[in-house]
Design a protein with these regions (language model features):
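A polyanion-binding, active-site-adjacent surface
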Residues: 1-168, 174, 179-214
């Protein structure tokens, strides 16, 4: 049961081709399927969309190096799901920071960076197999936070539920067997700049996750 694709995964030809082009253009980048961050025995799972070109695709760690990570990891630290110093710039010179997660794991619906940050439906479906296996392997999992509608739909699909019965809405809470799914708008710079999401709004979602787990 594979919870992550191989580093040279070619299951999605378009993504593999884009990855290879990035190897040529950005040879110092990670340029491979980005593995999840955090332990499998965690009670909280954050599911994002996909690595950003100059974020996780560069650093090799989810939400590390782009604006979305600042919002996400700030909230996780606030509610004791993370500790240490979040210093993404260290990854770009071959180093690492002291940042770590507590009882939390961060993953993505799609593990490879897609062109224009837009995976196709078939790419989402293909990579969903890894996310499904990952969720199944998290035996202590209590809460999933989906960042954005695609991540939400991926989780609903994994639990074999009808999408129409589980509408995405920021702050919404859904019961999936013995797991609670919380919805949030994605922590992207675009959502922050347009006012769709604020740090306080996102903090409230992570605070709810803490209440459900505590």
């Amino acid at each position: 049961m594979n919870i992550a694709p191989e580093k040279n995964c070619d299951l999605c030809p378009r993504l593999a081709e884009f990855r290879q082009a990035n190897v040529q253009q950005y040879p110092s980048f990670y340029n491979a399927p980005v593995p999840a961050f955090g332990e499998l025995d965690s009670e909280l799972l954050i599911v994002g969309l996909a690595p950003g070109l100059k974020g996780a695709n560069q650093s090799g760690r989810p939400f590390t190096g782009d604006y979305a990570g600042i919002i996400l990891y700030s909230a996780l630290q606030k509610y004791a799901f993370a500790q240490g110093e979040y210093e993404p710039e260290k990854f770009f010179v071959g180093g690492k920071d002291s940042f770590s997660l507590n009882n939390c794991r961060v993953s993505n619906s799609v593990r490879c960076v897609p062109p224009d940050n837009k995976p196709t439906p078939s790419e989402i479906t293909t990579c969903n197999n890894f996310l499904s296996n990952e969720i199944a392997a998290m035996k202590k999992l209590k809460v999933i936070v989906s960042l954005g509608q695609i991540a939400h739909k991926s989780v609903i699909s994994i639990f074999n539920r009808k999408q129409a019965d589980y509408k995405f809405a920021h702050g919404a809470k859904h019961k999936l067997e013995n797991i609670i799914l919380l919805n949030s708008f994605h922590t992207s710079r675009y959502n922050i700049n347009t006012g769709r999401l604020s740090q306080a709004m996102f903090d409230a979602v992570i605070g709810e996750a803490r209440n459900l787990i505590a």
